[in-house]
């Protein structure tokens, strides 16, 4: 709760025009009374747009349109439960919710063909990334990511993994 209120306050201070949550805003597809009640204590910055990408923890069905984030949709916040893109003429902003391995297309370009104009906000597996004790074999390939967008921001992996200009993981 403190970190959310800090972010909402910082968004005012920095004159942001939107906040994008990269998935798993909630860590469970079911909320208890305490969690629902805590939502009242969030000091939302309603002067800007809020976009919430559905993560794997916010649903318990393969049809991610059934998700706990829909509760926030009641407050007129945007809930992204399918690949979506919006262009401002300079960049194409691409929003990619969690996609199960069996349903994932082979390439990001199949979702968003604009290449270098793309800025992708995602909550997905990435192949070749260290997840604690094991290395992911499923997900989008690093070479695919680096050739499909100008910037790729991903909320699924809970570490500080990055990809440098030479396409090396750091």
Which residues fall in each region the model found?
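Hydrophobic/aromatic residues located in beta-strands of well-ordered beta-sheets
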Residues: 19, 50-52, 93, 118, ...
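Catalytic metal-binding/acid-base residues of hydrolase active sites
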Residues: 25-26, 56-59, 99, 125, ...
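Conserved catalytic scaffold of divalent metal-dependent phosphoesterases
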Residues: 58-144, 167
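Conserved beta-sheet core of the metallophosphoesterase superfamily
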Residues: 52, 132-170
